[in-house]
């Protein structure tokens, strides 16, 4: 008797969850040191003053202050944190 073994159905059936990337703190918002500002793949947004970069290119605040987004030459976007002492003046 000729038998055909059942084929696998591994091509379908996946709908992966989103990675929750993007801007977490927008311009003008206050941040505490350690707060995540942007989660990204690669350096779409670059780190400015008082902003650190994680292993996965996550940008986070190094000091307490206010977030500021800046447009740089060549269409680059940079994020900085203005410290509270300066922001209060």
Swiss-Prot record:
GO CC terms: cytosolic large ribosomal subunit
Cystine bridges: none
SUPFAM superfamilies registered for this protein in UniProt: Ribosomal L27 protein-like
Region ranges (Disordered): 1-21
Keyword field: Ribonucleoprotein, Ribosomal protein
Keyword hit for Repressor: no
GO molecular function, one term: structural constituent of ribosome
Family: Belongs to the bacterial ribosomal protein bL27 family.
NCBIfam families per the UniProt record, alphabetical: L27
Protein name: Large ribosomal subunit protein bL27
């Amino acid at each position: 008797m000729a038998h055909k073994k059942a084929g696998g159905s591994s091509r379908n059936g996946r709908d992966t969850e989103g990675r929750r990337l993007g801007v977490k703190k927008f311009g003008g918002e206050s941040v505490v040191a350690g707060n995540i500002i942007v989660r990204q793949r690669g350096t779409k947004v670059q780190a400015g003053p008082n902003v650190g970069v994680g292993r996965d290119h996550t940008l986070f605040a190094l000091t307490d202050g206010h977030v500021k987004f800046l447009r740089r030459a060549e269409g680059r976007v940079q994020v900085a944190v203005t410290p509270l002492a300066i922001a209060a003046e």
